[in-house]
């Protein structure tokens, strides 16, 4: 019952974990959430682990594919996506991949706030801010199994910091899909159709779709597709990390 109340609370799980972390800091000095040895210098990480985070340098300006810019990659040129651009400041590689895996598969909820803060720190001050955030939804069965949606919790932290509303009900996932790591590129494209559905009219203006990791971009394309059906919205995708190779990530 308590878990259900936390999931349905408007501030989400991250607000509760933040309170617990603040209380715990008075009892035990904070240490790095990754190596557990060195002191935390900010964002939950020690100086060594923070300096080791893989920055997404020179990415494709459209899909954020690492080490490809400054011109759009071949896929974005030949098959332009429905979103304007993906903003993913980190590459999905160690130690960033460890942080995200720990959050998703070990239920390390204390990592939500540090990951969101790292993304916020990397956001360009010149970036156009959206009118609302829409986290990538999970299907009901997957949400029950995991107990929380990382994209929802990350979006809530980002939204509170930027004073942007996070709309968790605008898009729903109506069909369960296999893990992307088990699919080829053609299979990912084939199953994309009809997976997500927008259940409310799309608001005009800029919308940011929020996810933890972008792999093949098929999820980003599918969510943007259903948001842009009326051609009155512009979509960007905000993610913590971008995989250099599509099979790098377990979903």
Which role does the model predict for each range below?
Residues 1-251:
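Glycine-rich phosphate/pyrophosphate-handling loop used in enzymes and phosphotransfer proteins
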